[in-house]
Amino acid sequence: MPVSHPTVYEPLTEQGAISLAVRLGLFPEGTPLACREIGDGNLNLVFRVVDQQTKKGIIVKQALPYAKVVGESWPLTLKRAVIESNALRTFASYVPQYVPKVYYSDESLAITVMEDLSHLQIARKGLIEGKTYPLLSQHIGEFIAKTSFYTSDFGMNQQEKKQLAQSFVNPELCKITEDLVFTDPFFNHETNNFEDELRDDVEALWNDDKLHLEAAKLKRKFLTEGDALIHGDLHTGSIFASDEETKIIDPEFAFYGPFGFDIGQFFANLLLNALSRPEQQQEPLFAHIDKTWDVFSTVFSDLWRTHNVEPYAKTEGLLEDVLHHTFIDAIGFAGCEVIRRTIGLAHVADLDGIEDKEERLQAKRYALRLGRSLILQRETLSSTKEIRSLFAQTVLAATN
């Protein structure tokens, strides 16, 4: 895969993106090209370069040296562009059907040129609109299972795994997660962002020593358990989808982390969407949670039995222990994500987009209670069906 020679970093423009596409020969000579900046995230510029005749295009993504959501006062490493392109290539070696093709990367300019997925829709947007994406959980479960297994000590030579893990050391972006997911929402921190009407609920979390202990345990797992190469930010805004197709994007937070983290992030964002819906429209979200875990555990178990390089692989109870801890960790991580997406720095449109103010505030109160329950009760849950029950109990208790 071509990688450029060192150059001096400068932010890309629409004309610059067109010039790059021409230089790389990604379109036939003389093709009339148009370009538009389409990024709506916090950390990058994203350009779509399109053949005006065929409407076929490419995506040019460039990391910014700061977070757009804050500005230049929050500097960020450009190395994350290398992390992202390398993660996409690594994932593609196991599940090419679930990630965009990478055509080119430039380390100095922090640029990745990749497949255009504009025929698909960001899953969060579609779910908010009421779409169900029937294959979403099948695909996400398989993606997490295969990438987790094959990049772990069970799926590859342990020494090779250590070398691969070294290439994905990602301290700056891991710190964002450590702060925004596992720390700041649980304290009176300046990055938090919530409505005044929620202050009593939020201060209750800040003063909850039992919750703090469990959140600290989950943070420690994130800090210390390097099970496999994980996406690191697998929410529904990092997924393109249709009824037939799923593509995972934006793995710039990728690093060697706990098996359960990506699952927990995905669960949390499905639960947040469920909280935004009337009860009679929540079933597809719970079905996706069920299916994700079913597929993950089945595929991971099949790979364990057929491709495991660990001498202890056939030891009775080891697979079950790995899956058990992955599940309860995922539940806890989901709880942290639900809380942070409600009162932390980066919210989700699922809740913030609820038009009626009282309904929006109520949904956020439910989210805080649900997040707390997921964290505190994670070790008592043994199946995804029990997540449904916990969800119902949280909402029911809040209405009584």
Swiss-Prot record:
Pathway: Amino-acid biosynthesis; L-methionine biosynthesis via salvage pathway; S-methyl-5-thio-alpha-D-ribose 1-phosphate from S-methyl-5'-thioadenosine (hydrolase route): step 2/2. It comes from the Bacteria. InterPro entries: Aminoglycoside_PTrfase, Kinase-like_dom_sf, Methylthioribose_kinase. Pfam families: APH. Keywords: Amino-acid biosynthesis, ATP-binding, Kinase, Methionine biosynthesis, Nucleotide-binding, Transferase. The keyword Chloroplast does not apply. The keyword rRNA-binding does not apply. Its EC number is 2.7.1.100. One of its GO terms (biological process) is L-methionine salvage from methylthioadenosine. GO terms for molecular function: ATP binding; S-methyl-5-thioribose kinase activity. ATP binds at residues 44, 61, 115-117, 250-252. Belongs to the methylthioribose kinase family. Catalyzes the phosphorylation of methylthioribose into methylthioribose-1-phosphate. Homodimer. This is Methylthioribose kinase. It comes from Geobacillus sp. (strain WCH70).
